[in-house]
Amino acid sequence: SVIRIDDRYLAQRNIPKSKTLAGKRIALVGCGTIGGYLSDMLVKAGAGSCGGKLTLVDFDGLLPQNIGRHRLGFPDLLSNKAEAMAKELKRLSPGVEVHALPVDVRQAQLGKLDLLIDATGEESLGHWLCGRYRAPTPMLSVWIEGPGTAVRALLRTNASGACYRCLWQSHRRGELRSTIDALPNILAGHGCEGLYVPFPASVSVQ
């Protein structure tokens, strides 16, 4: 018997009545806590297949303190996150077209996109991306709030819809909150390690 293993079949098999990301030009900015896992899921949804292209953008390296909640592990320690994730995705799905840009996204040339994803969790950079890549380029912003209390996302599909800046302005006024009570301000780490917000790796895939 013949067993299908082509990219289109693998992307559509589990969601036969839904559209996939096959054939789309997608850029993922930030390959950290969220972006690492998200890039894996994007490929499983068809990104980088059937003529499409997935571009990973991150200038940061994978450090020892990242290992506990990152998609990558010790074999990629001290490697650039975008390059290491691209290598891992190609290992898992040899047919996909995945490119790494180990640079600050403000110096990157991403070209025309079908979807831009901001997974950096940095408010100021999110505002810059919204201004640089205006509608009609669809943009998905994803971030973790507090010590893993909530994972939020905002999809901008047109110029008249809600934008990232609007959401943050509402957030400062206490509107559109993810929780009824204020988010706790919890920090961990000391000495040479530096401070960080503690939450488990499972938060990144909620």
Task: Please provide the spans of the model-predicted regions.
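Glycine/serine-rich phosphate-binding loop and adjoining beta1-alpha1 elements at the start
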Residues: 1-25
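Residues at the starts of beta-strands that form the adenosine-phosphate
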Residues: 25, 53-54, 138
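Hydrophobic Val/Ile/Leu positions in short beta-strands of Rossmann-like dinucleotide-binding domains
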Residues: 28-29, 56
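Hydrophobic/small residue at the entry helix of a nucleotide-binding pocket
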Residues: 34
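Conserved S-adenosyl-L-methionine
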Residues: 45-53
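Glycine-rich phosphate-binding loop and adjoining beta1-alpha1-beta2 segment
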Residues: 53-94
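A structured beta-alpha segment of the ubiquitous adenosine-cofactor-binding alpha/beta core
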Residues: 84-113, 120-124
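E1/E1-like adenylate-forming module used to activate ubiquitin-like modifiers
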Residues: 114-115, 119-206
